[in-house]
Structures are given as structure tokens and as C-alpha cells.
């Protein structure tokens, strides 16, 4: 049996995974729920420190090839989306547990596809590990979510010209639909028009950070695919997502985890 060691704080927890019949039976009766989704679209300003750090590391704008990652004071966006998923305590953790799932690009300074990485609230120094992207996409196919989602970052806009016309209108509709349903928290004081303006400003290839805007569009698409599920399907998907990230289930071998 293997051992998985995760970065921990002062107190460690040991858990056996995929070892006993009871573990698998608990998995079968576990039904987690999505408690909240946050994808902030409020404007952030690129700071002098961010620019200086990027230049010191020799970073170039992946869209233009110019030195640095935007201009000081220009608009950008937060890089991630966060799901909060609640386990009522029947399942493998054996107690009530809340998971924070961070969704963001694989590359924080360039165009990339998304990754899904949960942590256990209260164990924030110990990440469960990234969910295998291919398995997440397989899950999405099972639930019919690929009708609304595209996993390849290359098909998304990478500048203000691409993010215009019908494409812009489509995202405006998607954001409004989720905002009206209060499915996603887009940040304090953010309405649909503000969200679209901030995304467009971030797509400025000379001043902004277009790879961040592109990642945000991917995240919005994922959220919309989740939004279009029934409440029961949504819960089932979130449950499977957590198990996939934790490599829990009969497709994986037995191991012990210290976190």
C-alpha cells in the first residue's frame, strides 16, 4: 500500500484510502452538495510589484512577446473560480467536511487549459492534489456538460477583437442568466455591464493580461455547464469531482494519506 504525503500545518491526519469494503460502501451513499460558486469579475489593478517581479523573472507577454505582463495601473481580473462543496459526513471523511475547489489556468502567466484542485477547509495547507483533467472531462461528458463547455483554450478569444460582436453578446447572456439565478457570486457591486467591461479591458494586449481574461471565459463556461444541470445532477457531479481529485474509488489502488 502506498503513502501519500501532503504539506501540512501543525497537526497531521492519517486516512486509509481504497482499503476496506466499508470505505467503498460509504462512497456509494455519500451525496455532497454545491454550497456556493465564486468567480469575481471586479476590476483589479496591475501593481508595480507584479510588473517588477515579472521583469526580474524574464517573463514576456505571451500574446505580444513584449517584456513584462501588462502595464502598471491597467485592469486585470482575479485568476480563479472557487467552488465550495459540502459533505454531510456519511462519506469517507467520516465527518462533516467542506471542500474548497480552486479552478484556474495551468499557467498563471500564459494561455492554458483549466485545472481543478480541492483543499479541505481547515486543512488549507494540505492540497488533495489536482483532479486528473481527462477524468474531469469524462465526468462532464457523462453529465452532458460538454454541450456548454470547450476544454481547449485555443478556441477562446485572446484579444479585444475576438471578444466582441456575437461572442461578447453570448457571454453577456450567460453571465446575466447565472447572475439573475444567483448561482454565481461575481463580486461586490458587479453587474453584467461592469463584468463585460472588465473582461474587455483585461483583453487589452498591450496594457492588460489577455491570458487571464481568456481563462476567465473558460471558467465562466464551466460554471454555465454546471448551472445547466439539475440540482441532483449537480450534487452528483460535485461528489464525483471530489472523489476523483482524492483518487478515491475502485479504479485506484489502496494507499494511506497523511495531510
What are the residue ranges of the model-derived segments?
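Short, positively charged
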Residues: 1-259
Amino acid at each position: 500500500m502506498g503513502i501519500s504525503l501532503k504539506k501540512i500545518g501543525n497537526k497531521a491526519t492519517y486516512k486509509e484510502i481504497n482499503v476496506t469494503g466499508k470505505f467503498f460502501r460509504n462512497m456509494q451513499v455519500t451525496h455532497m452538495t454545491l454550497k456556493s460558486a465564486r468567480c469575481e469579475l471586479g476590476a483589479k489593478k496591475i501593481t508595480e510589484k507584479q510588473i517588477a517581479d515579472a521583469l526580474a523573472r524574464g517573463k514576456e507577454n505571451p500574446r505580444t512577446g513584449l517584456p513584462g505582463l501588462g502595464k502598471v495601473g491597467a485592469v486585470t481580473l482575479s485568476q480563479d473560480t472557487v467552488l465550495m462543496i459540502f459533505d454531510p459526513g456519511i462519506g469517507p471523511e467520516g465527518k462533516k467536511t467542506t471542500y474548497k475547489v480552486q479552478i484556474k489556468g495551468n499557467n498563471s502567466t500564459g494561455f492554458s487549459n483549466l485545472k481543478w484542485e480541492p483543499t479541505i477547509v481547515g486543512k488549507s495547507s494540505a492540497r488533495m492534489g489536482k483532479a486528473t483533467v481527462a477524468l474531469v472531462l469524462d465526468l462532464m461528458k457523462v453529465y452532458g456538460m460538454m454541450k456548454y463547455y470547450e476544454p481547449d483554450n485555443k478556441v477562446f478569444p485572446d484579444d479585444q477583437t475576438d471578444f466582441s460582436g456575437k461572442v461578447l453578446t453570448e457571454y453577456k447572456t450567460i453571465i446575466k442568466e447565472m447572475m439573475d439565478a444567483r448561482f454565481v457570486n461575481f463580486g461586490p457591486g458587479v453587474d453584467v455591464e461592469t463584468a463585460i467591461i472588465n473582461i474587455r479591458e483585461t483583453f487589452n494586449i498591450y496594457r492588460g493580461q489577455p491570458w487571464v481574461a481568456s481563462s476567465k471565459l473558460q471558467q465562466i463556461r464551466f460554471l454555465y455547464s454546471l448551472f445547466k444541470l439539475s440540482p441532483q445532477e449537480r450534487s452528483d457531479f460535485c461528489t464525483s469531482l471530489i472523489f476523483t481529485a482524492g483518487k478515491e474509488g475502485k479504479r485506484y489502488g489502496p494507499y494511506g494519506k497523511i495531510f
